[in-house]
Every structure is written in structure tokens, then in C-alpha cells.
Amino acid sequence: MTMHFDPTFESLRTYSAPQWFRDAKFGIWSHWGPQSVPMFGDWYARNMYIEGTPQYEYHLRHYGHPSKFGYKDICALWKAENFDPESLADRYWKAGARYLMTQATHHDHFFNYDSKLNRMNSVNVGPHKDILALWKKAADRLGMPFGISEHLGASFSWWRVNKGCDRFGPYAGVPYDGNDPAWQDFYHANQEHGTDDPGAAAPWYTQNPQFRDYWLRCVTEMIDRFHPDLLYTDGVLPFGEHWMDKQEAPDPEAYRLGLQAVARLYNTSIADHGENRAVYLQKDRRPEIFSVGVLDIEKSQLPGIMPEPWHTDTCIGNWFYDVHYPYKHPEQIIEMLVDIISKNGVMLLNILQRPDGTIDDEASFILDKIGEWFAVNSEAVYGTRPWRVFGEGETRVKIDGFTEEKTSWSRSDIRFVQKDGAVYAFLMGAQGGEAVALRSFADQPVRSVELLGAGPVPFTQEYGVLLVSLPERLPSLCANALRII
């Protein structure tokens, strides 16, 4: 067991994910901040400065022109007046979550805690509450590992558009409020990136050395203040230039500050617990990079079992509250979770909060349905490990970055996990009253089969096929689980 990490690849590649993370399987994320105020979804702080986007048009009509009413003014409107982290944490625990992720800062450079490095924070502006401290208190009461997400690394180049102006109409040529010298500490002195929108906010990470140093100071402040069990970076390990699964050889110098942050996270955990219980999540899919922590795959999955745990983050709808965006059905969320854990993954689900801090009735319904499923099937989730195969059947989830389509499962589709000598088989498409054929037990005599929530069920095993008869009424709305010994 490593008892101290140096800020080098050689040292940090000795990392191994802690037991609690391997066992937890499911967490909930509060991806929440002042961008929830307009209730118009993700990247509002950016798109409101891009002439012609729906969010720009909404902002113009609802708040006024961004030269007069900018994002700093949106931040002042955020009050979080009905935010009750204790009751929300209780709801999330009841729904099956076994860790809590909270947002320290998004690309909008607004901090959700009492920062000494950034005056634009939730104690000084808007809610006048230390959002992260309140969340941590609630998580600690329940014994839930507590995580923080930082999206700061991309902010400097992502927010170049606040330095622009309209090209057409009555405000053509009038600078947006991001040009105000009095607010450069918030909007960034990022003129070097120009003002044009490149579409994908490229480059994701700036080369600006002053901002990179500032990023490290801020992340260090987050770690020292909250001693998180998880730290999530929205991007690759800073400040790498590659994304997803590109194969270029990494330049160690580019990652120097990122490695310092990861080492501090782990060494803080060792000092607190006598061992490292912390998890670092980032999105570079090259093993030589992600082996310093745990690979995160945003809104997508993997085609097969990965030897070490991996992580998916997803949401019930948009990333920030959006009155226009439909939510996933509970069944889709549960089926995603089952497919992920069968491949050694862990799933983080963003439950959207309105600007006042509450969740809406649809989100509450989703939590209730997930909780009902966990009440029956939790033993097939917590503490399990992948089996020798992840499943049976021809249906596969669509593997495409940032794409999540509901999978149409058939009666032959099964997903497996194992624990304590039992194999759990999730029935992805089977209906009540059917007989299910499982072909992965040809060389393994079966002594008993139990349907979780219903009890023992009839089965036969011959000619390499385990045939299980299901009752007319199944206990769960989807992904019913067999316990096979």
C-alpha cells in the first residue's frame, strides 16, 4: 500500500481505487450553480455572449443586453432560498446513492464555497451560503463519501466570448460586460484567445501560465478546505492537450500542475485516514494517463469489462436545470447502471436542482422509482464484482461519446455480477411468466436460483442451458435479478 505519493507519473501510477468506491456503484451529483437561474440548461454563462444562440436570445428578452446585464448580474440573482441539503441527502441515500458529488465551480468561474481566492463565490454573492460546506455536513452525517467537481481548467479559454460584442442590430459594436476592467478578475484577462466562438470551446485548456498557476492554487484550496473523497476534473488531467482516446505520447511537463493536485489529494487522504481513500476522476482514455486515478467517461459507457474500476457521469436531463429538456425514464437509468456495473463501472447521476435549491416533481418521481428498485435488488449491486463475462444476448448499448439512447433489450439479454459465491443475473428484457435461458453456466452446476424480491424459482439445467421459469408478476419494474448458486 502506497503511503505517500510524489507528483510524478511513476509514483501516481501505483494508485489503486479504494474499497469503498469499488463497492458503492452509484452516486448522485449536485451539478448546480448560478447557471440554473435562467432555467435554460448548460453553458448558459457562455452562450449568453454568443449572438444568435437560443440562450442569447432568451437573455436579451428576459434580462437585457449582455453589455448592461451580464453573467455577474445573473450570479447576484441566485438565492438558493429553499436549499435543504440535509433532506436532499436523505432522499439520495434512500434512492440508493452511496456517495455524493457536489460542484465547487463550473466553467463560469463562480465558486460554491467561501473562497479566499475568488470574490465571486456563494458566500459573498447570491445565496450568501457556503454551499459545499453545507453539502459536506449532510454527507458526513450519513457516512457518504463526499466529492467535489472542478470545471475551472477550461474556464479561461471557454469564456473568451464575454469579451465580444454584437455584430448586428442596435447593439452592434457595443462591448459585452466581460470587457469591464473592474471585472477582469472574474471574467478573466483572456483577450489572447480572441472573441470568436470556435464551436467546441477549443482549446479546452489555455497555455496561459498565470491562469494555470491560479488553477492549482484554487484546486489546492478546495482540497485543503474540504478533504474530499473524490475530485472530478471536467477534462483530461490538466494541462494535457489531448482528449478522449487519441494516441499521441504525453508530454510530462504539460501535466506537472495536474500531478501536483492529484498527489495533494491522495496525501491529504492518507494523512486523514492512514491510507488513501480518495479517487481522482478525469477523462483521458490513455492508460498511461488515467492510471493516476480512475477513468471517467461522460455520458457514455464501455463495450466490455475493464480490469480496474471506471466511472460514468450522466444526468437525468440537461446538466443545469432546463425547463425545455426532457428527463430520462427511471427504467433507462436503472438499465444503464446495471450494464455499467457488469463491466466494473460506477455511475454518477446528476439530479437537477432549480435555482431555489429544490428538485421538481419529476426528479422526485425518478428518485422514488430508483429507490424502489434498490430496495429489492441492492444485494446484487453493492459490493459486487464483474463475473467472467459481463452478459449474454446480442443487444449492446450504443458506445458514442455524449450519446445516451434508451436500449431496446430482448428476453435473451442478461447482465452478470458476482459476490460471496453467488452470481447475480439481471434480466434486461424478460417479462413475467416467461422462461429465461442462460447459456453461461454450461460448465457450472447450479444448486439454487432465487428471484430477488420473490424467492426461489423453478429451474432446470441440461444440455448446457440453465432454464429459469419466472412468475407472472415480477417484483421490479425492470432489470429483475436472479441469485444463482
Language-model-detected regions and their locations in the chain:
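Mature catalytic domains of secreted/periplasmic carbohydrate-active enzymes
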Residues: T2-I485
